[in-house]
Amino acid sequence: MKTSMQRKLDQLTTRLAELNDLLSREDITSNLDQYRKLTREHAELGPVVDHYALWRQAMNDATTAQELLADASMRDFAEDEIRAARERMEKLGAELQKMLLPKDPNDDRNIFLEIRAGTGGDESALFAGDLLRMYLRFAERNRWQVEMMSASESDLGGYKEVIVRIAGEAAYSKLKFESGGHRVQRVPATETQGRIHTSACTVAVMPEADEIGEVEINPADLRIDTFRASGAGGQHINKTDSAVRVTHLPTGIVVECQDDRSQHKNKDRALKVLAARIKDKQSHEQQAKEAATRKSLIGSGDRSERIRTYNFPQGRLTDHRINLTLYRLDAIMDGDLDELIAALVSEHQAELLASLGDAD
């Protein structure tokens, strides 16, 4: 283990002891906000410090066994002990490296998931519906809550555009690598000759702002229009101007919400989505600056980048960023995304470790 890493772990051990003292003080426990903040920090540091204690124990075991090598009768035993202790140190050291990786501040946030049909017309809209079902099934498996924010349905089913809010533990950390272009290859239901067509959708995963105030939005920068909500094919579904369109003039970002009969609720939803889109835009601008110095395969989230192909005739999914191919498309489309997400997270961690190594 590098000296710099050991020094950092010693500091965290000291900090955990400080937190134990602070959390036992009456002036801290009576201040709910401060108590929550310190409790969260304690929960994050605990596993790291525990791992470090095991690493130090393994190092002590190796040192003790080293002293036994001089005794011929104990040499074989000592060599076995040293080997086992070093293996534990190596394993724990690798785990500690990952634990110390910079944490994405958005990882614990709820998200807005936006799917837009792209090239391919009706087939693209149908695939957008299939992607939505895939993510909703994954949300069910994780016991996340889902709320429909906005939907523009196509005439033959599916969606031209759909936005849902997904709330639950680690929603952003698990789905943040889904942003980008998703391509499908299959025989459309409308195809009479049995030919395989290619179409595409784009997915955007945006962390929800904790409060709308977290993203600075000047009311003077907003244009808010109301209109009658309409369903698929353009038919009006109610007779009041309950649908809301919010335009953020400085960025040109437009959000429409019409799924609720209440204009107030639609406006509230639209403002939440707008805040998330502005935050997402700011985040991407920051990432673009960082990308000038370090190219990331996984985390760019570029909407125009084709990240994945779903080949239905072959039952194959390919993630082009990490050259991963899985022949279990039916299960994946039914929401079984764990293997895919684990591979993306692992690659992202490897990139972070490599960048830290370069920095050293």
Swiss-Prot record:
Q: Which residues carry this modification: N5-methylglutamine?
A: 235
Where is the region Disordered?
280-300
Q: Enumerate the Pfam families for this protein.
A: PCRF (PF03462), RF-1 (PF00472)
The source's superkingdom equals: Bacteria
GO cellular component, alphabetical, reads: cytoplasm
Basic and acidic residues bias locations: 280-293
| Localization per record | Cytoplasm
Instruction: List the Gene Ontology MF annotations in alphabetical order.
Output: translation release factor activity, codon specific
InterPro entries this protein is in? PCRF, Pep_chain_release_fac_I, Pep_chain_release_fac_I_sf, Prokaryotic/Mito_RF, RF-1
Q: Which UniProt keywords apply?
A: Cytoplasm, Methylation, Protein biosynthesis
Q: Where are the transmembrane segments?
A: none
Is-annotated flag, keyword Cytoplasm?
A: yes
Q: Which SUPFAM superfamilies match?
A: Release factor
Report what the Swiss-Prot or TrEMBL entry states about this protein's PTMs: Methylated by PrmC. Methylation increases the termination efficiency of RF1.
What the entry lists under Gene3D superfamilies is as follows: 3.30.160.20, 3.30.70.1660, 6.10.140.1950
> What family is this protein classified in?
Belongs to the prokaryotic/mitochondrial release factor family.
What HAMAP family does its record include?
Rel_fac_1
Any idea what job this protein has?
A: Peptide chain release factor 1 directs the termination of translation in response to the peptide chain termination codons UAG and UAA.
What protein am I looking at?
Answer: Peptide chain release factor 1
Q: Which organism is it from?
A: Paraburkholderia phytofirmans (strain DSM 17436 / LMG 22146 / PsJN)
Classification from the root reads: Bacteria, Pseudomonadati, Pseudomonadota, Betaproteobacteria, Burkholderiales
